[in-house]
Design a protein with these regions (language model features):
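Carbohydrate-active catalytic/glycan-binding domains of CAZyme proteins
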Residues: 1-286
């Protein structure tokens, strides 16, 4: 089967996250950079203005920025390494514009200071309770196996109002070959199933998997679909991951990933966009 894969003109960008706002697509990626496009998903232009007011405690690792619109403001969920603790952690920044500047509203890392935490994402449940779902990175767990975690957020998104809970381990699925949890993204289906896209490594490389909550809640029991959403086994040539789903200006859903996960010859990690569809309570690529 020949799948449609849109290759962007961006030469190198990891963890691409796309939103559609006022007829314009915005793509954010590691390094705290932003690109935009209004007429094509292939051709993007770098936004040259300052995107983020860099927090004073930031010592690099400006990873996986996501931008979510909430209560009329734009919130960036992202990662950086702390000068004080030397650990990576998640933070939340706010702006009036999708082009920034985004200013930190949390008191530094919002995630536990004794953890390395990355890839925070945003979800609002059926009771309008905001959550951060994030990675408890394998480098700071007692057995070098990554976890997915979640905590409730305050209404203003400045702090946790619950202790983080563990959702699942990286080594739970039968296909998983590494202890990596990466790139969580929440998706609610039309029949109210709560899915999570996330990445680990199968026998062919970096991939995108689907987990689902058995009771439709963040703190429910999470089970793993056997069929991967994206794998080199299916698509050939390159692996890829850190997926998210967005809807374009015409209402078509797409999966955004970086592919490959590491350079292959002259091919760098670049944003790749693939049409996806919701069918029978899951996400599929045709």
């Amino acid at each position: 089967m020949k799948h449609k894969i849109i290759e962007t003109n961006i030469e190198r960008l990891r963890d691409p996250f796309v939103i559609t706002e006022n007829g314009t697509h915005y793509m954010y990626g590691t390094g705290w950079v932003c690109y935009k496009s209004s007429d094509s998903l292939e051709h993007w232009t770098r936004v040259e203005k300052e995107l983020v007011v860099v927090p004073s405690d930031c010592d690099g690792d400006k990873w996986a920025p996501e931008v979510h619109k909430y209560n009329g403001k734009y919130y960036m969920f992202t990662t950086y390494r702390s000068l004080k603790t030397k650990r990576r952690g998640c933070t939340i920044l706010q702006s009036d514009s999708p082009e920034g500047p985004f200013v930190e509203i949390t008191n530094g890392h919002i995630t536990p200071v004794e953890w390395d935490s990355i890839d925070g994402t945003f979800y609002v449940d059926e009771e309008n309770q905001p959550w951060m779902v994030f990675v408890h990175e394998w480098v700071s767990t007692d057995d070098n196996v990554g976890r997915m975690a979640a905590a409730k957020l305050s209404e203003d998104l400045t702090h946790f109002i619950s202790e983080p809970i563990e959702l699942f381990r990286a080594d739970t699925p039968a296909w998983a070959k590494h202890g990596v949890t990466d790139g969580c993204f929440m998706y609610k289906t039309q029949d109210n199933q709560l899915l999570m896209l996330w990445s680990n490594v199968d026998e062919y490389g970096y991939c995108v998997a689907i987990a689902r909550s058995k009771n439709g809640k963040v703190d429910g029991e999470w089970v793993h679909d056997e069929k991967l959403l994206f794998s080199k086994e299916t698509f050939g040539q390159y692996d890829g991951g850190h997926g998210m789903i967005f809807t374009d200006v015409d209402g078509q859903m797409y999966l955004s990933i970086h592919s490959p996960n590491n350079p292959v010859g002259d091919r760098l990690e670049k944003p790749v966009i693939i049409p996806v569809f919701e069918e029978n309570g899951t996400i599929v690529i045709k």
